[in-house]
From Swiss-Prot:
HAMAP family listed in its UniProt record: Ser_tRNA_synth_type1
Protein name: Serine--tRNA ligase
Domain notes: Consists of two distinct domains, a catalytic core and a N-terminal extension that is involved in tRNA binding.
Subunit organization: Homodimer. The tRNA molecule binds across the dimer.
Localisation: Cytoplasm
Main function: Catalyzes the attachment of serine to tRNA(Ser). Is also able to aminoacylate tRNA(Sec) with serine, to form the misacylated tRNA L-seryl-tRNA(Sec), which will be further converted into selenocysteinyl-tRNA(Sec).
Reactions accelerated catalytically: tRNA(Ser) + L-serine + ATP = L-seryl-tRNA(Ser) + AMP + diphosphate + H(+); tRNA(Sec) + L-serine + ATP = L-seryl-tRNA(Sec) + AMP + diphosphate + H(+)
Gene3D superfamilies with a match to the protein in the record: Bira Bifunctional Protein, Domain 2, Serine-tRNA synthetase, tRNA binding domain
Binding site for L-serine: 232-234, 286, 387
Record-stated family: Belongs to the class-II aminoacyl-tRNA synthetase family. Type-1 seryl-tRNA synthetase subfamily.
């Protein structure tokens, strides 16, 4: 979320950002926040004065009694003070809740390089890497190919779990595991520490890391509990250091999360028939970094370079796009996507999302770094995240781009060391 002191100091910046995003209807929220904030500070002054008065009035009552003065007015005032304090505290608590809710629904401040656009059709291509392969035979749908070869079972998964699930089998299991090891090894050489996080997270922690609308659209809630299955390891890793203070020497902290990811929202995008691309459950390796604010933009480019290296070494053509104002969402200040080439559709499809969230998540989670020059001064850290690889999407890429006429699939060179030097599925 945005910090109240930032909104208080720079309301025009927030309003201009909302205009740039194409959400001018939220500008009224800024004025509401400022009005509530002014009332909250006024109440604090009043309540502090009431508490000071409560401390002094007891002495005045004793003094009046000692000197024979009428203490009745003081006694009446003393009797009223607790109720006034209680009423002020209740109003301030209510106002604080309203302010926090509004702050959490205001989006992050966009970086100046984010392109203006209404939706994903206006994202801006930065570069293309690799040359798409030409085929002299008709490609099979990746899901059909997997089913025909006994590498996946979508029909029985639909029977046991519903649409959007799959049983992965045989060689495709080994290929999935090879992708995981490849990505972990690559990131390990770059100083990332692997983390397997909890696969469930409490709502109060989850609220600090994602768009509140996702609770209705994306996440699976555990019945009878205020707990959710994670949509990505980014979320529990971001909340891992909630309410903690880093020392400068400990940053940047580079972590790579390995986890299943659970998402409800695929129906809104259209589900591939017998496919691995849009599913309710998949495995993902996620890059995550906590850093000092002055380093975050450089690290953002590093995370993108790491993800590009994954797909370059896999020999999969892709392009990088700069996500526009109408597609970027609430949390990121800037976001890149990598979209890999899908030859059956003759199109690029998203396989990586790489975001700099600046201080937005840290403000919600209260994660700070101590200033080494001034021990008492603490600043919000910046958080960044990027897919390294979502294995189900990478599997689709490989099944299409490396498909052979006889129905076999060539295993990318870089993965063969993890598959006993096997060349084909």
């Amino acid at each position: 979320m945005l910090e109240i002191r930032f909104v208080r100091a720079s309301p025009d910046v927030v309003k201009a950002d909302l205009e740039r995003r194409g959400t001018p209807e939220k500008i009224a929220w800024v004025d509401e926040i400022l009005a509530k904030d002014a009332r909250s500070r006024e109440l604090k002054v009043q309540t502090d004065e009431l508490r000071r008065r409560r401390n002094t009035i007891a002495r005045e009552i004793n003094e009046a009694r000692k000197t024979g003065k009428d203490a009745a007015p003081l006694l009446r005032e003393a009797a009223e003070l607790p109720q006034k304090i209680k009423a002020n505290d209740a109003e301030q608590e209510e106002i604080s809740g309203i302010i926090r809710t509004r702050l959490m629904r205001l989006p992050n401040i966009l970086h100046e390089s984010v392109p203006k656009g209404k939706d994903d059709t206006e994202n801006v291509e930065i570069r293309r890497v690799g040359t798409p392969r030409t085929f002299d035979f008709e490609l099979k749908n990746h899901g059909q190919l997997a089913a025909d070869n006994g590498w996946a079972d979508f029909e029985r998964a639909a029977k046991t779990s519903g649409a959007g699930f799959y049983f992965l089998k045989g060689g495709l299991v080994m290929l999935d595991l090879a992708l995981q090891r490849f990505a972990l090894d690559l990131l390990g050489k770059k100083g990332f520490t692997p983390v397997i996080p909890p696969f469930m997270i409490k709502r109060d922690s989850y609220e600090g890391v994602t768009d509140l609308d996702d609770f209705e659209k994306v996440m699976y809630k555990i019945d009878g509990d205020d707990t959710y299955l994670i949509a990505t390891s980014e979320h529990p890793i971001a909340a891992m250091y909630q309410d903690e203070i880093f020392e400068e020497k400990d940053l940047p902290l580079r972590l790579c999360g390995l986890s299943p990811c659970f998402r409800r929202e695929i129906g809104a995008h259209g589900l591939d028939t017998k496919g691995l691309f849009r599913v309710h459950q998949f495995t993902k390796i996620e890059q995550f970094v906590f850093c000092r604010p002055e380093n975050s933009w450089q690290i953002h480019e590093e995370l993108l370079a790491n993800a590009e290296e994954v797909f370059t070494k896999l020999g999969l053509p892709y392009h990088v796009v700069n996500i526009c104002t109408g597609d970027i969402g609430t949390v990121a200040a800037k976001k890149y996507d990598i979209e890999a080439w899908m030859p059956r559709e003759n199109a690029y499809k998203e396989v990586v999302s790489c975001s700099n969230c600046t201080s937005y998540q840290a403000a919600s989670l209260n994660i700070r770094v101590r200033d080494k020059e001034n021990f008492e001064t603490k600043h919000l850290v910046h958080t960044l995240n990027s897919t390294a690889i979502a294995t189900s999407r990478a599997l689709r890429c490989i099944l299409e781009n490396y498909q052979n006429r006889d129905g076999s699939v060539t295993i990318p060179d870089v993965l063969r060391q993890y598959m006993n030097d096997r060349e084909f599925l």
